[in-house]
Amino acid sequence: MPVIGTTLRELSQRGDSVRRLLRPISKVEGGPAWGNRTGSGNYIIGTHDGSPPSSDFREWRFATSNSSMRAMYFECWKEYGRGRFYLFQAYLSLFQVDRLKTEREFIALHCDPDEPDNSPHSTYKKGPHLHILVADHPLPHAHIALNRGQLEAVLSSPQSISNAIGLALHMIREEILDAI
């Protein structure tokens, strides 16, 4: 049974919730624009500035509150029954941008609620966790769990996972974006 499930009807309205979720780190007061992609049993919600630059949602970016950082956020929901979907991934990446507009992935906030229980790092990966990508080994591949002690509650609904991600975004804003 999927961990975080929802209906297609609820999912089709989730884009505005995602936009509001990202307000703390977005340059745009109301949050970034969003779009969806469907196909092969997937429902993707991605965020961007203006019009999406390509059909690949992993290339979409939005401006953050820090002019030297851009962000990418998407949610991948997979169909498991007629009109029923579960959250497979929720991924945020922050990219440091230099004067030449070259991007370097800086930090990532991931959530993989469908990670199998028997996988080696599932208790760290299922809930929101950080990857410090600009650090030396082993940090870029470490799953720094933010809610391990509250995992059951965090994974109980789309709203509860959004709340946990929202708290992590506030931390990222205060501890990283405002500090650089």
Feature names for model-found ranges:
Residues 10, 29, 59, 75, ...:
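Glutamate identity and glutamate-enriched acidic tracts
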Residues 15-29, 96-98, 168-179:
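Hydrophobic, Leu/Ile/Phe/Ala-enriched alpha-helical segments that form helix-helix packing faces
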Residues 38-100:
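Amphipathic, interaction-prone secondary-structure segments
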Residues 8, 13, 18, 69, ...:
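Short, intrinsically disordered low-complexity segments
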Residues 82-157:
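An exposed acidic His-Trp-rich patch
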Residues 1-60:
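N-terminal "first-domain core" detector
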